[in-house]
Amino acid sequence: MLARKDPMLGWNAIDICSKLRPTAPEVAALGPEFQGAWDRDFADNPNRPLMLCGVVSCFLGDPASIPEGQYVTSGMYTAYPYSRGHMHITGPKHDDPLDFDVGFFTDKDDIDLKKQMWAYKKQREILRRTNYFRGELAAGHPKFAKSSPAAVQEEVSGPVPKDAKNIVYSEEDDRAIEQWIRENVQTTWHSLGTCKMAEREKDGVVDSKLNVYGVTGLKIADLSIPPENVGGNTNNTALVIGEKAADIIINELRGGAGTP
């Protein structure tokens, strides 16, 4: 492929990305706590997606675990999680173990879990209407009862009609979805905020001049300092942080305020 300069070498296998937001009836169906979170954080901001979706032209898993074939994977993830984990040092040495907890699905009202459950159902409806749909890979789906309308269809002749009725999920199906999500959730590669800029009493690590609280002569200027996630690729955010950090440091070297 290198010798013939195959164009595939410049392809990341992701041809489609999208931002997804639920309809008003879908929000209401997720319960009053979800409705409250939606009204507070999303309803008046139409550019803020509930979920981000990347359609990848491969199987996002161990290829040795499935038969050879052509696969498409829909990756769903939230850019605005409510759950919070933690990462703390436990001693002064570089090899002292970290106190680390990812904190998946630990938010008070299970908003993150409800987001993922809604997203699973939504992306499934989208993909089974695409022209290339020829079935579902059981390894990438919850274990529904064979008698359930939600049961995986491993081989079909083509997509369902655009106006086909959506799959109806029972309480048993929802429990299967929840279990599958809890067992398979992972972190994507845009994580940030582990040393967020905020007041110390609000669990902040750095102040507005990038100084680490309680440490003299140490600044942080990378993607760990944003106080919350951003709804997109993080390259531009990193560049802005770097530019602003340069201004702060240059000003301090010239004798300006800001050095602790």
PLM feature spans:
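A Trp-anchored, charged/polar loop motif used as the substrate-binding/catalytic surface
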Residues: 68-72
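C-terminal structured subdomain/cap of oxidoreductase catalytic cores
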Residues: 73-132, 167-260
